[in-house]
Amino acid sequence: MTTILQNDWAPVLADEFEKPYYVKLRQTLKEEYQTQTIYPDMFHIFTALHLTEYQNAKVVILGQDPYHGPGQAHGLSFSVKPGIKPPPSLVNIYKELKSDVGFEIPQHGYLNHWAKQGVMMLNTVLTVRRGTPNSHKDIGWETFTDRIIHLLNDRETPLVFILWGKHAQEKAAFIDRNKHFVIASPHPSPFSANRGFFGSRPFSRTNEFLRSRGLQEIDWQLPMQVEEE
């Protein structure tokens, strides 16, 4: 199983793939992919780990579970494939980016450019049934992604954890705030964005922290034209 990960996540997660809960999770997923329409495609489940290496991670943006509509999810929280209209939460993220850092809003919602710079866009649950949000809650993914958060917390180099909404903020209990920077606000969803997400300036605050630690800032501006990688 560890051959799925071809970067420095492989050794740090090797033991996790052998644990009984993960063996059970893998069997559940095998059955689900054979009998249901599951997102993302099984080859994209670990995109967040493939694109953002363990030692290169600078920022973690936690999501909940993948988009459950056709063609949307590709393994990064909040991101959608090229050619897919940005969903409402991402539209609000773009609005905050524009007001925070002068972001030029693209037509797409493909966030690979961030992931490659060290922004880990991690959902706490990595798969979902088509049209059924939270359908893979409690099958084992939370244990796996909690382990990822613990491993990142254990790193010497400080990180920024961006926690939007109560679900993500539950993970703050794992994070050493003496070392890492936690930015917590309401979720960018249209239901909550006006309660404190807008105006929270998470992107400039992230770069201020990285700069203060002598780390490379994130270029939040996305390319205007993208192709799926």
Swiss-Prot record:
GO MF annotations, alphabetized: uracil DNA N-glycosylase activity
GO cellular component: cytoplasm
Active site residues according to the UniProt entry: D65
Superkingdom per UniProt: Bacteria
The keyword Electron transport belongs to this UniProt entry's keyword annotation: no
Keywords annotated in UniProt: Cytoplasm, DNA damage, DNA repair, Hydrolase
Record Pfam families: UDG
Gene Ontology BP terms: base-excision repair, AP site formation via deaminated base removal
InterPro entries: UDG_fam1, Ura-DNA_Glyclase_AS, Uracil-DNA_glycosylase-like, Uracil-DNA_glycosylase-like_sf
Function: Excises uracil residues from the DNA which can arise as a result of misincorporation of dUMP residues by DNA polymerase or due to deamination of cytosine.
Full protein name: Uracil-DNA glycosylase
Organism: Brevibacillus brevis (strain 47 / JCM 6285 / NBRC 100599)
